[in-house]
């Protein structure tokens, strides 16, 4: 199977061909070669990683067909750049039921952790319970996903001390290979969050805001202060993905949208004035 980037015209087909080749290698008694193929083909390709290792999470429960849209490929392209030396910050705005949590709390951090592109993930949600539920899904894959356990034992086995897991709780997991995942509510005390001397190198915020019925402009301002003063300063060199849905006018996600629209309008005005310079803004 030839190497292909996630921009392959049909990543679902490519993943299927990889799995067929893996089955052939297993049938020939070449288990190590099968594992090496999976690892090598997914090293730089988050979408392919999800299709190979987390296929059931991308399968429609009614049709039993694997589903993948252009937006999922765009999200995978964002994550692929986490492997570079230059950190990036992105705000992703999407309606509900688009798979935001599946990709940003499971598939993309799992890919980054498996291939060493992230060593310490700090994940935040509106409440501690939400964040912990996502970490539980992540840990269930580590415990029960046969392919992950075969190919990435240093990720799937918890770090042990005196015969007991060092950190395998509702809000924290530390792997044998020293990867760490911490899940917190937005208003949980987060100042100075670090493990030994390590600070988060990937910060994910998913649905950081509650629904409009329990949210006000004052609360939005308070939550923005938490984001700017407590969460982002955990590591200014970390990759950051802030994912959410616009819950009301003036919410944090809505402010991202307005800022983006203003920058696009400014670029258009520059073109109208004959300027040759157009500035693009990464949220």
What does each model-identified segment do?
Residues 1-88:
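N-terminal accessory segments
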Residues 124-189:
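Conserved nucleotide-state-sensing and coupling region of NTP-binding domains
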């Amino acid at each position: 199977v030839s190497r292909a980037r996630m921009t392959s015209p049909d990543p679902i087909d490519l993943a299927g061909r990889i799995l067929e080749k893996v089955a052939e290698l297993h049938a020939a008694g070449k288990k190590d070669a099968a594992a090496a193929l999976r690892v090598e083909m997914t090293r730089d390709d988050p979408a392919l990683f999800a299709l190979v290792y987390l296929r059931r999470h991308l399968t429609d429960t009614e049709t039993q067909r694997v589903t993948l849209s252009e937006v999922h490929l765009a999200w995978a392209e964002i994550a692929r750049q986490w492997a570079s030396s230059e950190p990036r910050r992105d705000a992703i705005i999407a309606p509900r039921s688009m798979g935001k949590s599946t990709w940003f709390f499971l598939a993309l951090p799992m890919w980054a952790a498996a291939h060493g592109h992230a060593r310490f993930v700090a994940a935040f949600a509106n409440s501690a319970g939400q964040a912990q539920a996502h970490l539980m899904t992540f840990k269930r894959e580590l415990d029960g996903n046969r392919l992950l356990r075969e190919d990435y034992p240093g990720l799937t086995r918890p770090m042990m001390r005196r015969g007991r897991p060092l950190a395998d709780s509702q809000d924290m997991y530390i792997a044998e290979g020293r990867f760490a995942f911490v899940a917190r509510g937005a208003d949980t005390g987060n100042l100075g969050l670090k493990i030994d001397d390590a600070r988060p190198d990937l910060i994910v915020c998913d649905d950081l805001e509650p629904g409009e019925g329990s949210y006000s402009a004052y609360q939005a301002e308070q939550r923005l202060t938490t984001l700017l003063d407590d969460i982002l300063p955990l590591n200014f060199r970390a990759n950051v993905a802030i994912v959410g849905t616009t819950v009301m006018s003036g919410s944090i996600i809505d402010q991202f949208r307005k800022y983006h629209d203003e920058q696009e309008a400014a670029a258009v005005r520059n073109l109208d004035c004959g300027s040759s310079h157009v500035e693009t803004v990464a949220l």
